[in-house]
Amino acid sequence: MQIFVKTLTGKTITLEVEGSDNIENVKAKIQDKEGIPPDQQRLIFAGKQLEDGRTLSDYNIQKESTLHLVLRLRGGMQIFVKTLTGKTITLEVEGSDNIENVKAKIQDKEGIPPDQQRLIFAGKQLEDGRTLSDYNIQKESTLHLVLRLRGGMQIFVKTLTGKTITLEVEGSDNIENVKAKIQDKEGIPPDQQRLIFAGKQLEDGRTLSDYNIQKESTLHLVLRLRGGMQIFVKTLTGKTITLEVEGSDNIENVKAKIQDKEGIPPDQQRLIFAGKQLEDGRTLSDYNIQKESTLHLVLRLRGGN
């Protein structure tokens, strides 16, 4: 049967083969036609590198199938580059290649400009002027590719378990966008996420710039447990504050949340519900405060009763 072999230069070679031919035989035929030694040939079909001892039939290669020929440079090696989408790119490199070269190869394969690429290995960001050998990157090492958005920046999100997530964002991203990025990375639904920065809970409709969140700022992620609820707190000025709470939260917790939002110290807060002043040690459930209940906040003046 006839099969085709396409090179990286775009040239297509036609070969006469049998299904029972092994990959070594095919490489020998390519050497006959093109003069490329078998040990410099890598053949790819359906995204898989073909092994010398296997046959065309083993890989279900049939008539008029197209194989791709990649040259293995003398002294060269293969490395892998994994993107945030989970895609893995295979590159042919030399230990002496610098990081700029590697980014150029990624651009050739994926069309991503080098100035938008950040490469990470063993937790370190790789610098353009250094070589793969400088970082002890060896054959079949995996690098991680993070895209640097134009005008974008990196921020960190720390969870209660101590894990830190790195996100690529823009100052103009709103908090909903950030929660969506966290969902993409961690699988946590946005409605279960509460993001805290500088002691304040971030509101969905506001942007990172609104909160003066800059590059390498750290946000804190608190999970809103299912079974949580929203309540409202109305001040004497008529302002209404929305709080995320649990029925098991005690009144002290609620006052702390109000302090986070409004900056009012707990000892200056008096909370009223259904005509009763709420006591610190009791819980919302004790007072039968349910979702969307409204509490009234009265300020206790310093020195007052």
UniProtKB/Swiss-Prot annotation:
Any Pfam family the entry gives: ubiquitin
Subcellular location(s) of the protein: Cytoplasm; Nucleus
UniProt keyword annotations, A-Z: Cytoplasm, Isopeptide bond, Nucleus, Repeat, Ubl conjugation
Entry GO MF terms: protein tag activity; ubiquitin protein ligase binding
Gene Ontology cellular component list: cytoplasm; nucleus
Propeptide: 305
Function: Ubiquitin exists either covalently attached to another protein, or free (unanchored). When covalently bound, it is conjugated to target proteins via an isopeptide bond either as a monomer (monoubiquitin), a polymer linked via different Lys residues of the ubiquitin (polyubiquitin chains) or a linear polymer linked via the initiator Met of the ubiquitin (linear polyubiquitin chains). Polyubiquitin chains, when attached to a target protein, have different functions depending on the Lys residue of the ubiquitin that is linked: Lys-48-linked is involved in protein degradation via the proteasome.
Further remarks about this protein from its record: Ubiquitin is synthesized as a polyubiquitin precursor with exact head to tail repeats. Some ubiquitin genes contain a single copy of ubiquitin fused to a ribosomal protein. In D.discoideum there are 9 genes: ubqA: 5 copies of Ub and a final Asn; ubqB: 1 copy of Ub and ribosomal protein eL40; ubqC: 1 copy of Ub and ribosomal protein eS31; ubqD: 3 copies of Ub and a final Leu; ubqF: 7 copies of Ub and a final Asn; ubqG: 5 copies of Ub and a final Leu; ubqH: 5 copies of Ub and a final Asn; ubqI: 4 copies of Ub and a final Asn; ubqJ: 4 copies of Ub and a final Asn.
Designated name of the protein: Polyubiquitin-I
